[in-house]
């Protein structure tokens, strides 16, 4: 007997006559509809002690900054929580947006059920931090993640944290971070002993000059002197945020952007990962504009962006190169599509899996321009015919741009 598939349409199709011609409007149906569920995940944590320690470290990152008073800092402990693809991901930025941290609870790190894929943003108050700090290695801890709250259940007690607004600065930061991470390369892997040796060379106090991660024989070290294959690190003292976790780490992997725009420090605790990304300088946050602009220049139909959003939601992750091959799409087009989803905060990047993962946030294409005002300004100049190309030979472009007050600028790229 043949299988029967039932389709339910939200509206009727219609044939209408207008301006002496017939217009057919077909009702749309999609098998990939985003559902609203009261709970995304419910289950036990198999490594509750290390998961708790990583979440506390994440909260410390969110609380950290280099330009706020202690009173202002105490108000900041808001992680983004994503449940999907058998993984729990907790993310956050320092207030200066120059440090990004993420906790990944992998499939073996929990024993639970994913009822729906989703993302929420909650405030980890003192009650949650205290509950996390009291968890021991042998305890049975249950966690729930829903669209409006995150819950922690232990010893017959529960702590519930409610959803709070997601800062716009964070959405801008998420865009830059995933772009930098998607091109980062693994430079070093260290075992626990090497990791502890490395951090023993971390200088005290605030470091104002660049330092380098170098190898001295089999021992890694931080040095103010550059050497071959060294990794450049600005604001080295920010790595102290990792120190509480170092005694428990099985391994440390260090990744770097090809032009050292960021470094990523990833600690492993069995089925739990903690990663810390540093911007090039203390004063330079990931929320600054620029990283996504080149990928956003190419015009892409909005229907393609919507299709990519549905594909990402359905699969929860994808490798851009494989996606381009499988779907017969030019890789540059995939980069442009990925950049647009990232500009809405919808994509993150997993370095170990070399793939994007999906955050379920509101799909608002207008957010792309609102978070990238340089694009708006550039498009306005073009619309007002204030850009004149003088020369363009493929390697060099010279243009005259009319600015405010009629001042003409020469721009050479």
Task: List each model region and its residues.
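Long, low-complexity, compositionally biased intrinsically disordered regions
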Residues: 1-413
């Amino acid at each position: 007997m043949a299988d029967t598939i039932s389709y339910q349409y939200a509206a009727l199709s219609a044939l209408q006559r207008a301006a002496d011609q017939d217009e057919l409007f077909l009702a749309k149906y999609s098998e990939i509809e985003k559902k609203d569920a009261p709970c995304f995940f419910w289950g036990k944590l198999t490594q509750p002690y290390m998961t708790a320690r990583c979440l506390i470290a994440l909260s410390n990152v969110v609380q950290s900054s280099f330009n706020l008073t202690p009173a202002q800092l105490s108000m900041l402990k808001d992680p983004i929580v994503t449940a999907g693809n058998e993984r729990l991901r907790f993310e956050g930025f320092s207030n200066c947006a120059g440090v990004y941290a993420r906790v990944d609870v992998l499939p073996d790190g929990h024993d639970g059920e994913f009822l729906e894929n989703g993302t929420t943003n909650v405030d980890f108050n003192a009650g949650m931090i205290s509950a996390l700090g009291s968890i021991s290695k042998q305890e049975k801890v249950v966690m729930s993640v829903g669209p409006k709250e995150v819950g922690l259940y232990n010893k017959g007690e529960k702590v519930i944290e409610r959803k709070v607004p997601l800062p716009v600065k964070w959405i801008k930061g998420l865009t830059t971070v995933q772009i930098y991470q998607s091109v980062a390369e693994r430079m070093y892997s260290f075992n626990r002993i090497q990791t502890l040796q490395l951090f023993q060379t971390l200088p005290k106090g605030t470091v104002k000059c660049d330092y380098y991660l170098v190898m001295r024989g089999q021992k890694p070290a931080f040095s103010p002197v550059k050497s071959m294959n060294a990794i450049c690190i600005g604001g080295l003292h920010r790595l102290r945020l990792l120190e509480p976790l170092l005694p428990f780490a099985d391994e440390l992997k260090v990744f770097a952007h090809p032009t050292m725009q960021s470094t990523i420090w990833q600690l492993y605790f069995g089925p739990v990962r903690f990663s810390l990304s540093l911007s090039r300088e203390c004063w330079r946050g990931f929320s600054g504009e620029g990283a996504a602009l080149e990928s956003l220049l190419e015009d892409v139909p909005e229907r393609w962006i919507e299709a990519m959003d549905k594909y990402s939601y359905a699969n929860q992750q994808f490798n851009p190169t494989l996606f381009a091959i499988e779907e017969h799409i030019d890789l540059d087009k995939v980069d442009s599509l990925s950049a647009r989803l990232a500009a809405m905060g919808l994509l993150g990047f997993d370095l170990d899996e070399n793939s994007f993962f999906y955050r379920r946030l509101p799909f608002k294409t207008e957010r792309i321009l609102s978070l990238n005002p340089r694009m708006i300004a550039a498009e306005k100049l073009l619309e007002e015919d204030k850009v004149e190309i003088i020369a363009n030979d493929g390697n060099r472009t010279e243009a005259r741009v009319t600015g405010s007050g009629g001042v003409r600028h020469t721009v050479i790229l």
